[in-house]
Protein backbone atom coordinates (compact mmCIF):
# COMPACT_ATOMS: atom_id res chain seq x y z
CA UNK A 1 0.00 0.00 0.00
CA UNK A 2 1.41 3.39 -0.92
CA UNK A 3 2.11 5.95 1.78
CA UNK A 4 -0.71 8.23 0.71
CA UNK A 5 -3.12 5.29 0.69
CA UNK A 6 -2.65 4.43 4.37
CA UNK A 7 -5.26 6.89 5.54
CA UNK A 8 -8.25 8.38 3.83
CA UNK A 9 -8.86 12.01 4.70
CA UNK A 10 -12.44 13.01 5.38
CA UNK A 11 -12.74 16.76 5.77
CA UNK A 12 -16.28 16.71 7.08
CA UNK A 13 -15.66 14.66 10.19
CA UNK A 14 -12.12 15.95 10.60
CA UNK A 15 -10.21 12.79 11.23
CA UNK A 16 -8.41 10.01 9.43
CA UNK A 17 -10.19 6.85 8.43
CA UNK A 18 -8.15 3.68 8.37
CA UNK A 19 -8.33 1.94 5.00
CA UNK A 20 -7.30 -1.32 6.62
CA UNK A 21 -7.32 -1.86 10.36
CA UNK A 22 -5.18 -4.99 10.34
CA UNK A 23 -1.49 -4.30 10.75
CA UNK A 24 -0.72 -7.46 8.77
CA UNK A 25 -2.34 -6.20 5.58
CA UNK A 26 0.40 -3.72 4.79
CA UNK A 27 3.76 -2.47 5.85
CA UNK A 28 2.63 0.77 7.46
CA UNK A 29 5.32 3.32 8.29
CA UNK A 30 3.89 3.99 11.75
CA UNK A 31 4.62 2.85 15.27
CA UNK A 32 3.38 -0.71 15.93
CA UNK A 33 1.76 0.39 19.18
CA UNK A 34 -0.56 2.72 17.29
CA UNK A 35 -1.23 0.43 14.35
CA UNK A 36 -2.31 -2.43 16.61
CA UNK A 37 -6.08 -3.08 16.25
CA UNK A 38 -6.50 -3.01 20.04
CA UNK A 39 -5.58 0.67 20.09
CA UNK A 40 -8.29 1.39 17.54
CA UNK A 41 -10.85 -0.31 19.78
CA UNK A 42 -9.95 2.07 22.60
CA UNK A 43 -11.12 5.06 20.55
CA UNK A 44 -14.73 3.80 20.11
CA UNK A 45 -14.72 2.92 23.81
CA UNK A 46 -13.92 6.56 24.62
CA UNK A 47 -16.76 7.58 22.31
CA UNK A 48 -19.02 5.21 24.24
CA UNK A 49 -18.12 6.84 27.55
CA UNK A 50 -18.79 10.31 26.12
CA UNK A 51 -22.15 9.19 24.72
CA UNK A 52 -23.21 7.53 27.99
CA UNK A 53 -22.26 10.51 30.16
CA UNK A 54 -23.86 12.93 27.72
CA UNK A 55 -27.11 10.96 27.57
CA UNK A 56 -27.41 10.86 31.36
CA UNK A 57 -26.66 14.56 31.80
CA UNK A 58 -28.72 16.00 28.96
CA UNK A 59 -31.75 13.72 29.42
CA UNK A 60 -31.80 14.58 33.12
CA UNK A 61 -31.59 18.29 32.34
CA UNK A 62 -34.45 18.13 29.84
CA UNK A 63 -36.52 16.02 32.23
CA UNK A 64 -36.06 18.59 34.99
CA UNK A 65 -37.29 21.34 32.70
CA UNK A 66 -40.31 19.30 31.55
CA UNK A 67 -41.39 17.93 34.94
CA UNK A 68 -40.48 20.69 37.42
CA UNK A 69 -42.77 23.60 36.68
CA UNK A 70 -40.87 26.04 38.87
CA UNK A 71 -37.74 25.52 36.74
CA UNK A 72 -39.43 26.68 33.54
CA UNK A 73 -37.93 30.14 33.21
CA UNK A 74 -36.21 31.95 30.37
CA UNK A 75 -32.58 30.88 30.92
CA UNK A 76 -33.57 27.28 31.60
CA UNK A 77 -35.56 27.09 28.37
CA UNK A 78 -32.52 28.13 26.36
CA UNK A 79 -30.35 25.68 28.27
CA UNK A 80 -32.87 22.89 27.62
CA UNK A 81 -32.77 23.69 23.90
CA UNK A 82 -28.98 23.53 24.11
CA UNK A 83 -29.23 20.12 25.79
CA UNK A 84 -31.60 18.88 23.08
CA UNK A 85 -29.11 19.84 20.38
CA UNK A 86 -26.31 18.09 22.26
CA UNK A 87 -28.49 15.02 22.70
CA UNK A 88 -29.19 14.88 18.97
CA UNK A 89 -25.47 15.02 18.21
CA UNK A 90 -24.63 12.28 20.72
CA UNK A 91 -27.35 9.91 19.49
CA UNK A 92 -26.67 10.25 15.77
CA UNK A 93 -23.21 11.61 14.92
CA UNK A 94 -21.06 10.24 17.74
CA UNK A 95 -21.85 6.54 17.04
CA UNK A 96 -21.20 7.10 13.33
CA UNK A 97 -17.85 8.69 14.14
CA UNK A 98 -16.94 5.78 16.40
CA UNK A 99 -17.85 3.22 13.72
CA UNK A 100 -15.14 4.57 11.42
CA UNK A 101 -12.48 3.05 13.67
CA UNK A 102 -14.14 -0.38 13.60
CA UNK A 103 -14.93 -0.64 9.88
CA UNK A 104 -12.96 0.13 6.76
CA UNK A 105 -15.90 1.49 4.79
CA UNK A 106 -18.92 3.75 5.14
CA UNK A 107 -21.76 1.73 6.68
CA UNK A 108 -24.74 4.06 6.45
CA UNK A 109 -25.46 4.44 2.74
CA UNK A 110 -26.05 7.54 0.67
CA UNK A 111 -28.92 8.76 2.85
CA UNK A 112 -26.76 8.52 5.95
CA UNK A 113 -23.95 10.31 4.15
CA UNK A 114 -26.23 13.28 3.57
CA UNK A 115 -28.15 13.14 6.84
CA UNK A 116 -25.30 12.80 9.36
CA UNK A 117 -23.38 15.95 8.29
CA UNK A 118 -26.68 17.85 8.23
CA UNK A 119 -27.51 16.80 11.80
CA UNK A 120 -24.00 17.56 12.98
CA UNK A 121 -23.93 21.11 11.66
CA UNK A 122 -27.49 21.71 12.88
CA UNK A 123 -26.44 20.72 16.39
CA UNK A 124 -23.37 22.96 16.28
CA UNK A 125 -25.52 25.84 15.07
CA UNK A 126 -28.09 25.29 17.82
CA UNK A 127 -25.30 25.28 20.41
CA UNK A 128 -23.49 28.44 19.40
CA UNK A 129 -26.60 30.44 18.47
CA UNK A 130 -28.33 29.45 21.72
CA UNK A 131 -25.27 30.59 23.67
CA UNK A 132 -25.48 33.89 21.80
CA UNK A 133 -29.17 34.21 22.68
CA UNK A 134 -28.41 33.39 26.33
CA UNK A 135 -25.76 36.10 26.40
CA UNK A 136 -28.23 38.56 24.89
CA UNK A 137 -30.78 37.56 27.54
CA UNK A 138 -28.24 38.18 30.32
CA UNK A 139 -27.32 41.51 28.73
CA UNK A 140 -30.96 42.58 28.73
CA UNK A 141 -31.55 41.43 32.33
CA UNK A 142 -28.46 43.18 33.70
CA UNK A 143 -27.81 46.20 31.47
CA UNK A 144 -31.34 46.99 30.21
CA UNK A 145 -33.74 45.60 32.86
CA UNK A 146 -36.41 48.18 31.99
CA UNK A 147 -36.84 46.53 28.58
CA UNK A 148 -37.97 43.20 30.06
CA UNK A 149 -41.53 42.31 29.07
CA UNK A 150 -43.15 40.11 31.71
CA UNK A 151 -46.24 39.19 29.71
CA UNK A 152 -45.89 36.12 27.50
CA UNK A 153 -42.12 36.13 28.07
CA UNK A 154 -41.81 32.35 28.09
CA UNK A 155 -43.79 32.03 24.86
CA UNK A 156 -41.55 34.59 23.16
CA UNK A 157 -38.46 32.68 24.26
CA UNK A 158 -39.99 29.45 22.90
CA UNK A 159 -40.40 31.16 19.53
CA UNK A 160 -36.80 32.40 19.67
CA UNK A 161 -35.56 28.89 20.45
CA UNK A 162 -37.60 27.49 17.56
CA UNK A 163 -36.20 30.19 15.28
CA UNK A 164 -32.65 29.19 16.27
CA UNK A 165 -33.39 25.58 15.28
CA UNK A 166 -34.86 26.66 11.93
CA UNK A 167 -31.89 28.91 11.12
CA UNK A 168 -29.44 26.17 12.09
CA UNK A 169 -31.19 23.65 9.84
CA UNK A 170 -31.27 26.09 6.92
CA UNK A 171 -27.54 26.76 7.27
CA UNK A 172 -26.91 23.00 7.34
CA UNK A 173 -28.80 22.28 4.10
CA UNK A 174 -25.66 22.68 1.92
CA UNK A 175 -24.08 19.84 3.91
CA UNK A 176 -26.86 17.50 2.81
CA UNK A 177 -26.72 18.75 -0.77
CA UNK A 178 -22.98 18.41 -1.37
CA UNK A 179 -22.12 15.40 0.81
CA UNK A 180 -21.99 12.17 -1.16
CA UNK A 181 -20.36 8.76 -1.33
CA UNK A 182 -16.88 8.62 -2.80
CA UNK A 183 -15.20 5.41 -4.06
CA UNK A 184 -11.58 4.90 -3.09
CA UNK A 185 -9.67 2.24 -5.02
CA UNK A 186 -6.65 0.51 -3.49
CA UNK A 187 -4.46 -0.76 -6.31
CA UNK A 188 -2.29 -3.10 -4.21
CA UNK A 189 -5.26 -5.26 -3.16
CA UNK A 190 -7.60 -4.31 -6.03
CA UNK A 191 -10.28 -3.36 -3.50
CA UNK A 192 -12.65 -0.41 -3.57
CA UNK A 193 -13.64 1.34 -0.35
CA UNK A 194 -16.58 3.71 -0.04
CA UNK A 195 -16.23 6.87 2.04
CA UNK A 196 -18.53 9.80 2.76
CA UNK A 197 -17.10 13.17 1.73
CA UNK A 198 -18.68 16.65 1.86
CA UNK A 199 -17.55 17.60 -1.66
CA UNK A 200 -16.16 14.55 -3.48
CA UNK A 201 -16.36 16.04 -6.98
CA UNK A 202 -15.22 19.61 -6.35
CA UNK A 203 -11.93 21.42 -6.81
CA UNK A 204 -9.62 22.73 -4.10
CA UNK A 205 -11.45 26.05 -3.79
CA UNK A 206 -14.63 24.51 -2.39
CA UNK A 207 -13.07 23.09 0.82
CA UNK A 208 -11.30 26.40 1.47
CA UNK A 209 -14.57 28.33 1.20
CA UNK A 210 -16.44 25.71 3.21
CA UNK A 211 -13.95 25.59 6.09
CA UNK A 212 -13.57 29.37 6.33
CA UNK A 213 -17.34 29.96 6.16
CA UNK A 214 -17.94 27.35 8.88
CA UNK A 215 -15.24 28.88 11.07
CA UNK A 216 -16.71 32.38 10.72
CA UNK A 217 -20.43 31.56 10.93
CA UNK A 218 -20.29 28.90 13.64
CA UNK A 219 -17.38 30.18 15.72
CA UNK A 220 -15.80 33.59 15.18
CA UNK A 221 -18.88 35.77 14.60
CA UNK A 222 -21.07 34.33 17.41
CA UNK A 223 -18.21 34.40 19.92
CA UNK A 224 -17.39 37.98 18.92
CA UNK A 225 -21.01 39.01 19.55
CA UNK A 226 -20.95 37.20 22.90
CA UNK A 227 -17.73 39.02 23.82
CA UNK A 228 -19.39 42.38 23.15
CA UNK A 229 -22.38 41.43 25.32
CA UNK A 230 -20.14 40.36 28.17
CA UNK A 231 -18.06 43.51 27.94
CA UNK A 232 -21.16 45.60 28.65
CA UNK A 233 -22.35 43.13 31.31
CA UNK A 234 -19.03 43.36 33.16
CA UNK A 235 -18.98 47.13 32.82
CA UNK A 236 -22.51 47.44 34.23
CA UNK A 237 -21.84 45.09 37.15
CA UNK A 238 -18.72 47.03 38.11
CA UNK A 239 -20.64 50.32 37.99
CA UNK A 240 -23.51 48.83 40.01
CA UNK A 241 -21.09 47.72 42.73
CA UNK A 242 -19.98 51.35 43.22
CA UNK A 243 -23.40 52.99 42.82
CA UNK A 244 -25.56 51.03 45.26
CA UNK A 245 -28.30 53.21 46.84
CA UNK A 246 -28.48 53.47 50.61
CA UNK A 247 -32.05 52.14 50.85
CA UNK A 248 -32.66 48.61 49.69
CA UNK A 249 -28.94 47.99 49.65
CA UNK A 250 -29.20 44.36 50.79
CA UNK A 251 -31.86 43.47 48.25
CA UNK A 252 -29.97 45.07 45.37
CA UNK A 253 -26.78 43.30 46.38
CA UNK A 254 -28.60 39.98 46.39
CA UNK A 255 -30.05 40.62 42.97
CA UNK A 256 -26.71 41.69 41.54
CA UNK A 257 -25.10 38.56 42.97
CA UNK A 258 -27.91 36.48 41.47
CA UNK A 259 -27.37 37.92 38.03
CA UNK A 260 -23.61 37.63 38.32
CA UNK A 261 -23.97 33.92 39.06
CA UNK A 262 -26.17 33.28 36.04
CA UNK A 263 -23.95 35.41 33.81
CA UNK A 264 -21.00 33.39 35.09
CA UNK A 265 -22.80 30.13 34.24
CA UNK A 266 -23.49 31.25 30.67
CA UNK A 267 -19.88 32.44 30.34
CA UNK A 268 -18.64 29.01 31.44
CA UNK A 269 -20.82 27.39 28.75
CA UNK A 270 -19.35 29.76 26.16
CA UNK A 271 -15.82 29.06 27.34
CA UNK A 272 -16.35 25.31 27.14
CA UNK A 273 -17.74 25.60 23.62
CA UNK A 274 -14.84 27.79 22.46
CA UNK A 275 -12.26 25.48 24.02
CA UNK A 276 -13.78 22.23 22.75
CA UNK A 277 -14.44 23.30 19.16
CA UNK A 278 -11.37 25.45 18.39
CA UNK A 279 -8.98 22.52 17.70
CA UNK A 280 -11.54 20.95 15.35
CA UNK A 281 -11.89 24.17 13.36
CA UNK A 282 -8.12 24.70 13.22
CA UNK A 283 -7.47 21.19 11.88
CA UNK A 284 -10.30 21.54 9.37
CA UNK A 285 -8.79 24.80 8.09
CA UNK A 286 -5.35 23.21 7.90
CA UNK A 287 -6.64 20.27 5.87
CA UNK A 288 -8.74 22.44 3.58
CA UNK A 289 -5.74 24.57 2.63
CA UNK A 290 -3.66 21.42 2.09
CA UNK A 291 -6.42 19.54 0.27
CA UNK A 292 -4.16 17.89 -2.30
CA UNK A 293 -1.83 16.54 0.39
CA UNK A 294 -2.41 13.77 2.93
CA UNK A 295 -0.54 14.24 6.19
CA UNK A 296 0.18 10.68 7.37
CA UNK A 297 2.28 11.70 10.37
CA UNK A 298 1.34 10.13 13.68
CA UNK A 299 1.21 13.57 15.31
CA UNK A 300 -1.48 14.71 12.89
CA UNK A 301 -3.40 11.46 13.31
CA UNK A 302 -3.43 11.68 17.12
CA UNK A 303 -4.18 15.41 17.08
CA UNK A 304 -7.14 14.82 14.75
CA UNK A 305 -8.59 12.14 17.01
CA UNK A 306 -8.16 14.27 20.14
CA UNK A 307 -9.75 17.29 18.45
CA UNK A 308 -12.72 15.21 17.34
CA UNK A 309 -13.21 13.65 20.78
CA UNK A 310 -12.92 17.08 22.39
CA UNK A 311 -15.64 18.45 20.10
CA UNK A 312 -18.03 15.66 21.11
CA UNK A 313 -17.08 16.13 24.76
CA UNK A 314 -18.64 19.58 24.58
CA UNK A 315 -22.02 17.87 24.18
CA UNK A 316 -21.75 16.17 27.56
CA UNK A 317 -20.05 18.72 29.84
CA UNK A 318 -22.73 21.44 30.11
CA UNK A 319 -25.08 19.56 32.49
CA UNK A 320 -22.20 18.81 34.83
CA UNK A 321 -20.89 22.37 34.69
CA UNK A 322 -24.42 23.43 35.61
CA UNK A 323 -24.40 20.88 38.43
CA UNK A 324 -21.29 22.51 39.90
CA UNK A 325 -22.43 26.11 39.43
CA UNK A 326 -26.13 25.99 40.36
CA UNK A 327 -27.38 24.83 43.75
CA UNK A 328 -30.98 24.60 42.56
CA UNK A 329 -30.11 22.47 39.54
CA UNK A 330 -27.84 20.33 41.70
CA UNK A 331 -30.76 19.69 44.04
CA UNK A 332 -33.06 18.76 41.15
CA UNK A 333 -30.35 16.64 39.53
CA UNK A 334 -29.89 14.68 42.76
CA UNK A 335 -33.65 14.31 43.04
CA UNK A 336 -33.92 12.80 39.56
CA UNK A 337 -30.96 10.44 39.89
CA UNK A 338 -31.17 9.50 43.56
CA UNK A 339 -34.97 9.52 43.84
CA UNK A 340 -34.89 11.71 46.91
CA UNK A 341 -37.44 14.31 47.86
CA UNK A 342 -36.59 17.88 46.92
CA UNK A 343 -36.23 20.35 49.76
CA UNK A 344 -38.75 23.04 50.49
CA UNK A 345 -38.35 26.37 48.81
CA UNK A 346 -37.97 29.06 51.44
CA UNK A 347 -39.26 32.54 50.75
CA UNK A 348 -38.66 35.52 52.99
CA UNK A 349 -41.70 37.52 54.03
CA UNK A 350 -41.83 40.98 55.54
CA UNK A 351 -44.71 43.16 56.68
CA UNK A 352 -46.95 44.07 53.77
CA UNK A 353 -44.78 42.56 51.08
CA UNK A 354 -43.27 39.33 49.84
CA UNK A 355 -39.93 39.18 48.09
CA UNK A 356 -38.56 36.29 46.11
CA UNK A 357 -34.81 36.43 45.56
CA UNK A 358 -34.09 34.63 42.32
CA UNK A 359 -30.66 33.12 42.06
CA UNK A 360 -28.82 31.45 39.23
CA UNK A 361 -31.29 29.07 37.59
CA UNK A 362 -33.17 28.96 40.89
CA UNK A 363 -36.78 27.77 41.05
CA UNK A 364 -39.05 30.75 40.58
CA UNK A 365 -42.77 31.31 40.57
CA UNK A 366 -43.79 33.15 37.39
CA UNK A 367 -46.72 34.76 39.20
CA UNK A 368 -44.43 36.58 41.63
CA UNK A 369 -42.94 39.82 40.36
CA UNK A 370 -39.63 41.22 41.54
CA UNK A 371 -39.01 44.93 42.06
CA UNK A 372 -35.42 46.02 41.78
CA UNK A 373 -33.46 49.23 42.16
CA UNK A 374 -30.60 49.17 39.68
CA UNK A 375 -28.49 52.31 39.21
CA UNK A 376 -31.24 54.39 40.78
CA UNK A 377 -34.00 53.07 38.48
CA UNK A 378 -36.94 51.04 39.73
CA UNK A 379 -37.64 48.18 37.39
CA UNK A 380 -40.25 45.46 37.29
CA UNK A 381 -39.34 42.09 35.92
CA UNK A 382 -40.62 38.57 36.15
CA UNK A 383 -37.74 36.62 34.69
CA UNK A 384 -34.08 37.00 35.56
From Swiss-Prot:
Annotated localization: Cell membrane
Annotated transmembrane regions: 39-62, 77-96, 115-136, 153-174, 209-234, 265-285, 299-325
Glycan-bearing residues: 20
Cross-referenced Gene3D superfamilies: Rhodopsin 7-helix transmembrane proteins
Highest taxon, organism lineage: Eukaryota
Modified residues (Phosphoserine): 350
UniProt entry keywords in alphabetical sequence: Cell membrane, Disulfide bond, G-protein coupled receptor, Glycoprotein, Lipoprotein, Membrane, Palmitate, Phosphoprotein, Receptor, Transducer, Transmembrane, Transmembrane helix
GO BP of this protein: G protein-coupled receptor signaling pathway; learning or memory; motor behavior; phospholipase C-activating G protein-coupled receptor signaling pathway; positive regulation of behavioral fear response; positive regulation of respiratory gaseous exchange; psychomotor behavior; regulation of cell population proliferation
Positions of disulphide bridges: 113-196
Membrane-protein topology: Multi-pass membrane protein
Ranges in the topological domain labelled Extracellular: 1-38, 97-114, 175-208, 286-298
Protein family: Belongs to the G-protein coupled receptor 1 family.
Protein name: Gastrin-releasing peptide receptor
Primary gene name: GRPR
Amino acid sequence: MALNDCFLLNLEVDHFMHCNISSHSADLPVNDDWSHPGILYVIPAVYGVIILIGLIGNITLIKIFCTVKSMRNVPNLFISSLALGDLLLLITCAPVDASRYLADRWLFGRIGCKLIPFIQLTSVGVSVFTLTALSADRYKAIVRPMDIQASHALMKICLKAAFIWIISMLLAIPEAVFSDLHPFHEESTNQTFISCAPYPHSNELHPKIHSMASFLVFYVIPLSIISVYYYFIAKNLIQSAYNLPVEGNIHVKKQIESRKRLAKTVLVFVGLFAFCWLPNHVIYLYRSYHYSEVDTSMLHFVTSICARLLAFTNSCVNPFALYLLSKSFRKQFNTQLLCCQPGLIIRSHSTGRSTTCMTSLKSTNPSVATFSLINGNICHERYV
